[in-house]
């Protein structure tokens, strides 16, 4: 069932795009075998009946398939995008037209973004959600910091970025409109499942400080998410985004990737596969050694800035590309980010210079010495801002994990402490297994003797929890 709410309990760019969205959703379903298998397996038992899910995750065609899967399993859903540029408007229209409360369009302002996040939590019957499905942690942090402000709002007067200015302003609005709302709403949440590295890091920090208010399932570190979505997804979507944004010839160019985690590995492979000569920066000696042995030059951003043509940040950290770095670049260097937040690049510092908008999500910044850079998606996620994100097939694995996590939290959330958990190995293997037939993969089967020899069951799990893949 869907969250059939009051008329106009949604905001999308153009509801007439719904039919176009439905056609693409139908195509995506054929590429998302994990989610379709979840509907078949769990649909009859309705394990999410009674679940009231607030979802903050890129409102794409693939996410539409996830939303409709959650609803097919019994949930009521309200949704926003977790990035101002990542919505696919026809996907949002199709979901809204089907009766789901969704508040998202491509090109939101920061004020709208936080207003929509608040509206996602406002159920028509006055009750709140009992589950959160998050990507980056914004929905979770809205409740946590909002409750903090109910007892001491002084920090709201000290935003440290443009993003925080609008974030804190929205908290103030809700404090004025509904005193005590944050505490009440947070108390009703059984748990959160988190999609991405940045959001998971926030959750672990909260747990470490003893401030995590409910159980959390770290979907990002499921092997069938991080080793597939983060790596193989970026491997296909990064170059797609840069090409759509700039029409640049990759072959022969020097491309630099900051960070060599799973996202950085996929990004470097993407650029190298297009003929670019790739360099990498890293703080972790293990990842740096991996990059070197994968054939990439490893150097610092200070060294790379004047030498390379294309720059991609993929660290999950802040201030990776500073204004000084960008001023040192070649004329017309291309700058983009594939990490979750835009603070990997010092975009606010660039506001002091001349901006020329070339087309949506493509800007040229001119420095006083006449040199220019091309900035994609204002430093936000380039693969969703300048292209359509990861392909459906790889997102099927990620979103099947999300579905399993939501079922677990709904049925057994009260059995968990307020800590961060990962899904067990047998579910990781199950998600992978669901995607093999689509690729024509035939698994080898262990004999009883072989299984006993290595100490596993014939049907798995085949690796210990600590295995790194």
UniProtKB/Swiss-Prot annotation:
Cofactor(s) required, per the database record: NAD(+)
Gene3D superfamilies found in the cross-reference section: Adenosylhomocysteinase-like, NAD(P)-binding Rossmann-like Domain
SUPFAM superfamilies: Formate/glycerate dehydrogenase catalytic domain-like, NAD(P)-binding Rossmann-fold domains
Binding site for NAD(+): 196-198, 230, 259-264, 282, 317, 338-340, 383
Cofactor binding mode and count: Binds 1 NAD(+) per subunit.
GO molecular function, one term: adenosylhomocysteinase activity
Catalytic activity: S-adenosyl-L-homocysteine + H2O = L-homocysteine + adenosine
Keyword Cytoplasm carried by entry: yes
Pfam family, one: AdoHcyase
Keywords for the protein's UniProt record, in alphabetical order: Cytoplasm, Hydrolase, NAD, One-carbon metabolism
Main localization of the protein described in the UniProt heading: cytoplasm
Principal EC category: hydrolase
Enzyme Commission number, as recorded: 3.13.2.1
GO BP annotations, alphabetical order: L-homocysteine biosynthetic process; one-carbon metabolic process; S-adenosylmethionine cycle
UniProt-annotated location(s): Cytoplasm
HAMAP family: AdoHcyase
NCBIfam families according to UniProt: ahcY, PRK05476.2-3
Function noted in UniProt: May play a key role in the regulation of the intracellular concentration of adenosylhomocysteine.
Designated name of the protein: Adenosylhomocysteinase
Source organism of the structure: Hyphomonas neptunium (strain ATCC 15444)
